[in-house]
Amino acid sequence: MNINNRIGIYPGTFDPITFGHIDIIKRACKLVDRLIIGVAENINKHTTFDAKLRTSMAENEIKRLEIDVDVVSFNGLLVKFAKEQNASVIIRGLRAVSDFDYEFQMSWVNYKLLPEIETIFLPASEDTQFISSSFVKEIARLGESVSKFVSVGVQKELINLNRIGSE
């Protein structure tokens, strides 16, 4: 791996993508030469939006930010996807201590599977540390504004989802 072309993967379900995710993406771009947003098609995790729509929402956010980041959906082991993308770094965001426990375990497993791929943890910024996709979906489901947590485009998808769900 050429150190002058460091590729990083920022994986997640992005169900939906929030300002917390965007914060990590912007900061991760400073650490790598090329960042790939890996939208996971996790069969063990029930998602509200399908992978195609989650990928589309992430792509729209990247276009809005005018940053050079690739968005790719993947399925299966994260380290396998990272290797396929020639990545040397996996970037994970941490909101709280509870995130660290899980993420630390996953980084250890990933290291055992592919030691040449490192994991970097980025703590959430103070103003995004309590944003979670689950909270955003619940607030939207209850009919409240989520404009402080997600973009207008994501808000529209949540409104559409809740409109369909109430029919």
UniProtKB/Swiss-Prot annotation:
Annotated site residue numbers, Transition state stabilizer: H21
GO molecular-function terms, A-Z: ATP binding; pantetheine-phosphate adenylyltransferase activity
Catalysed reactions, as listed in the record: (R)-4'-phosphopantetheine + ATP + H(+) = 3'-dephospho-CoA + diphosphate
Cofactor(s), by name: Mg(2+)
GO biological process, one term: coenzyme A biosynthetic process
Coiled coil location: none
Enzyme Commission number(s) from the entry: 2.7.7.3
Enzyme class, spelled out: transferase
Family, per entry: Belongs to the bacterial CoaD family.
Name of the protein described by the UniProt record: Phosphopantetheine adenylyltransferase
Organism lineage string: Bacteria, Pseudomonadati, Pseudomonadota, Alphaproteobacteria, Rickettsiales
